[in-house]
Amino acid sequence: MEAAFNGSANYAGGLGVLEADKFYTAGRIGVPYILIAPFYPNGYVDWDYANKAKHVEVRHRHGFSFLSKLSYIGGLEIKAGSGRFIADVDLYEYVYGSAKAILYRVKRPLTTAKLFRYLYRHHRDECTYYIAAAAISSEIIKRIASSIEIYTVDIQEAHLALTPYLLPKNIKTRFVTHTPGPWGHPKICIEAEEVLGISLPNVKTMTEVAMEICEKVFTVSRKHFVTTKKLFPKYVNKLEYVTNAIDLERWRRIEGDIKDIDSFSKARQNLKKEFISILQVLSGKRIEDKMIISWCRRIVRYKRPYFIEWLLEENNIDLRDRIFIVVSGKPHPSDEWGRKQAETFTKFSKALPNFYFYPSYGIEFAYYALTSSDLLLFTPFSCWEASGTSMMKAGVNGVPTLSSRDGASLELIEDNVNGWFFGVELEEFIDIEKNDIASKIDEKDYNDFLKRLTEIVDIYESDKEKFIEIAYNAYKSFTPYVDMKRLLKQYYSNFIEELKDKQ
């Protein structure tokens, strides 16, 4: 579990931003929202260049502005029902409006504490991590329930799948799955039965462990809903979807409701000018009047960053020289493929005048890149992206997206109206690591990607009015649907109505 609070180093990708966006929006509109998550004292990994473009790991520290907002509220000794010692933790509270985050820092045993020092460094002993996370979070929930009524507990991702088994039956639990990818469905932690004194269902994955006991299972886009029904057909009757959203106050930089396209165009020019200043200072490169095209997200195989590599490598000199490409993203620290891909981008960044790679991707760089580029590229392999929110952050600022046919793009983009699509939409989930057909799909998708990108650059250069119209359409059409208030109303509709009645 991660939550990318402002100033924190607990950021790895879209899930952390999503959870923090929920938190901030809920706190702002008066929803008594409680988020329980680990406090990782060493944050997440950060990356930088070294000699010969080597991608090296560096420390990513929490900002003092974030740490100063944490209040120590006590400690807990966590034991299983049998009395078996699980962990000692310190608890910290982070308050924003009506929302509250309770962050736990594991102190001992040392072997368990090490699993919670860095975000996503628990892979050497995943089962111990799952057991501790469930035992700690369930104890916190029970203590909260002793003083206030809990409307529902939403379990985010499979690593917390054991939590509902430790809660009283009168506490309603729901499960939200955030990825179709295999890493999101780890094998069952059968040792938990002995350690925690619980009985688990006869299933293979932690995802199924959660799906068995929770009364509802949410996916995070319509496409993800369709894919998940096929991956987990046993639980079709429990499945629903609520498409992800963003905190508009955190991500929308174009202020107010711009009614005319001329005012919109001026606002876009100001944002781009600001981003150009940042890029030129960071890179030392001249951008001039080139179209800025960005690819910004985790560097992982299914998101297909190699489409950018192919664009830079192949005989696309005419197209390449007409644009300035910005790439930013972090690979998982255990992902050797991702690290090598990042090193490839580093080499290109050193060699090419119109390409820049920023390795230390986080909230701050995303704030400028996603909102100030001319075009965003969204390239996941079809059926692999649960939702995606980068195109939402871009769209509400009038940045259109060239997207593969996956995730929430299918609900937001109308081709040639407020953005563009490329490639094919697959109906079945394909294991891209094991199925040879994936490379053939990649080849076809890339050819269409290149064709559509060339068309878009042509429009930008020769018919600027049409390009601005499409960008303006993105701004107008995205904003109502991607507002986090819509998501909160869908997840907690009954509660929010009750809250209104009491106010």
Predicted segments with their positions:
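Catalytic cores of carbohydrate-active enzymes across secretory and cytosolic contexts
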Residues: 1-503
